[in-house]
Amino acid sequence: MLPSQTSQPAAEPVHVIGAAGRSGQAVCQALRDQGIPVVPIVRNASRAAGLENIRVADLTAPTELVKPALADATRIVCTAHARNIPALLAAAPASAKLVCLGSTRKFTRWPDAHGNGVLLGEKALLDSGRDGIILHPTMIYGAQGENNVQRLAALLRFLPVIPLPNGGTALVQPIWQGDVTACILAALAQTWHGPRSLVIAGKNAVTYKQFVSLVEQASGLRSRPFISLSAKLLMACAHVTARVPGLPEIGPDEIRRLLENKNFDISQMQDFLGVQPIDLQEGLARTFKR
């Protein structure tokens, strides 16, 4: 059963942790556009250009140093890495609603520090019993300065042919930054009790080969032929290409994860949050229109 869905008073401020990051900046702007007061919280004031009334706090610092920045918080968005959720729980007022960003990396077959940190943060939230939600996005694209499709487009400019592991048949379901922001704002507007975890993803899944072709089209690049190579060979090549000046780097771990299907059911995202994500082709068109 879905919880009741009622709006919070618009005048309640939202404390945004990680406000200087890509998702944090997008959330702050969207809140301001709706007339909702924002309390931006950053680790480094020098990175907070364009943000007003900032507070400086680092979730890796002792709890007593973080508490003052959150003392008056009733709604908190945390776009910092999910590994910081235990520290957030310790520092935030017990009554504050929490909306945190995780990652679908938690599902990888090859655990790493990033994915393990997401699992740690998710477990802390779910075990806390607090009114909070952790949203797990797939690959996020479309933010200013993002390092996913923009880096891929930059790499494609160097390649006469496109090598993909196993022919690029694994599925991906990237989510546009605007939809990530919409999900965060939708969660803020909901009322529920207890902790929740929810995957957010794009409207449609495509093969990685199709994804690359769509990035080519959207970025104005000519179509290049594909070749299928083993992941092991491509991972070995990645160690070599990392030394080439000016060539965008793709790490061996990233290549290995191209073998995983990353397609997800988004019915909870649509039903609970009420967000209908845009089509990948439309999102890429918006991204490269900048």
Where are these regions (language model features)?
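NAD(P)H-binding glycine-rich loop region in Rossmannoid oxidoreductase-like domains
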Residues: 46-112
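Conserved beta-loop-beta element that borders a ligand/cofactor-binding pocket
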Residues: 126-143, 153-155
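Conserved loop-to-helix N-cap of the C-terminal "lid" that shapes the substrate pocket in Rossmann-like
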Residues: 134, 143, 168, 173-181, ...
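A conserved pocket-lining segment of Rossmann-fold NAD(P)-dependent short-chain dehydrogenase/reductase
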Residues: 154-175, 183-187, 191-194, 199-201
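Conserved glycine-rich Rossmann-like NAD(P)H-binding loop of the short-chain dehydrogenase/reductase
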Residues: 36-43
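Mid/C-terminal beta-alpha module of Rossmann-like enzyme folds, strongest
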Residues: 6-8, 12, 187-250, 266-267, ...
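N-terminal Rossmann NAD(P)H-binding glycine-rich loop of SDR-like oxidoreductase domains
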Residues: 14-34
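SDR active-site strand-loop-helix element
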Residues: 17, 41, 79, 98-104, ...
